[in-house]
Regions:
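Active-site-proximal loop and beta-strand segments within enzyme catalytic domains
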Residues: 73-74, 102-104, 124-207
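Active-site SXXK
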Residues: 90, 108-132, 157, 218-222, ...
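Catalytic-site signature segments of enzymes, centered on catalytic residues
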Residues: 103-104, 169-260
Length: 372
């Protein structure tokens, strides 16, 4: 009996170690490979107003300097860290890269593109194309299953509150959805179809269940107005003055892989964070102000289920994680992050290939965003 008890303890320890293994991605694909190795729709640079101010040490405050020093040490100390960027009211406070990442590298989003999808939906709503966030997705994407994703409201899809059961690891709606979409084996509508035996485990709107199928369903709503890539370019990318081309990974039918498929340079990721702050501050009109404020707010509690994504966060907004202190985070598997503090207009961007130092990332941003 004693030997059996010891065996159980050892097995539990091994299982815990396996579960605790940090998320890891390909360093080559994260630093630009995904934009060339697989089919993408590319969107041009050079349009809109570039509000990002280059690093100027004469403009830095003491707090900027201390925050930059902490970020620099973080990059040096962690071998899996690839990039780091701090922005204070449009000014670059710190910018750093580690090989093979460079200033021209198209850094991959993983799930940070979920938040970009939410921004597109907000623009379609405020432009009068989507009538109400409480409309069912099937009203705009009639091919969706009327019993599952199609019957879910846009608002509940935004909050990851469809109640739909995920069938794959890391929030994937079916097994290996990301890999199969990227490798041109399947298409987004097929992933969401009733052929996949999707089922609802909770009444929609009642529980947060991290499921990338919700993001794919949102991208299908955008097809009624030209698709995700077209609207992302029109409403967002063409307005921020990007330095370099952006690239959306697509499936075999040309549908954007909305839950994990955008590639952009580090500074352009920073510009996307600044755009989000601009919208939340009312610089894009009152409708987008209300929408983005909701997007970055605690709309639904994070259940923090064992083994689930986002254990560091207390709540969820619209396709965006929220911390107890109110800071909002775009989160990508393997250590991709954009931190946003609207009140002080601060942004942090990091990219990685192993997600093994995120506590330090959060601590630095909390420090950076703690004072003006």
């Amino acid at each position: 009996m004693k030997r059996f008890f010891v065996f159980l303890i050892a097995t539990a320890l091994i299982s815990s170690t396996a579960l605790a293994k940090p998320a890891q991605v390909s360093v080559t694909r994260t630093t630009g490979g995904n934009a060339v190795e697989f089919p993408n729709k590319h969107i041009p640079s050079g349009y809109g107003v570039n509000k990002l101010i280059p690093l100027n040490k004469e403009l830095q405050t003491r707090h900027d300097i201390k925050s930059a020093d902490r970020t620099h040490k973080m990059l040096e100390r962690n071998s899996s860290a690839l990039t780091g960027l701090l922005i204070n009211k449009g000014r670059i406070v710190f910018e750093g890269y580690k090989e093979p990442a460079r200033s021209t590298s198209k850094m991959h989003s993983m799930s940070m593109s979920k938040s970009l999808t939410a921004l597109v939906i907000g623009n379609l709503y405020c432009d009068g194309k989507v009538n109400s966030l409480d409309d069912k997705a099937i009203e705009y994407a009639h091919w969706l299953d009327p019993n599952t994703y199609g019957d879910t409201s846009i608002r509940n899809l935004l909050m990851m509150a469809s109640g739909m059961k995920k069938q794959g690891e890391y929030g994937q709606p079916i097994r290996k959805a990301y890999e199969r979409l990227r490798n041109q084996k399947i298409a987004v509508p097929w992933v969401l179809s009733n052929n996949q035996n999707h089922s609802r485990t909770h009444k929609q709107g009642t529980n947060h269940l991290y499921n990338s199928g919700d993001t794919l369903a949102l991208s299908q709503v955008t097809r009624a107005f030209g698709g995700l890539v077209k609207n992302f370019n029109y409403f967002i990318w063409s307005k921020i003055g990007p330095e370099h081309e952006g690239s959306w990974m697509v499936d075999k039918r040309g549908h954007a892989i909305s839950f994990a498929g955008f590639n952009a340079t580090l500074r352009d990721w920073g510009r996307l964070g600044m755009y989000t702050i601009d919208m939340a501050k009312g610089r894009g009109g009152s409708c987008m102000q209300k929408y983005v404020q909701d997007m970055l707010s605690e709309l639904i509690r994070n259940e923090r289920r064992p083994g689930e994504a986002g254990r560091a966060f207390s709540a969820y907004g619209y396709q965006t994680w929220i911390m107890d202190n109110g800071n909002a985070w775009w989160v990508g598997y393997g250590g991709q992050r954009v931190g946003i503090n609207v009140e002080l207009e601060k942004v942090m961007v990091v990219h990685s290939y192993i997600e093994n130092y995120m506590t330090e990332v959060y601590d630095i941003f909390n420090y950076f965003a703690d004072q003006d």
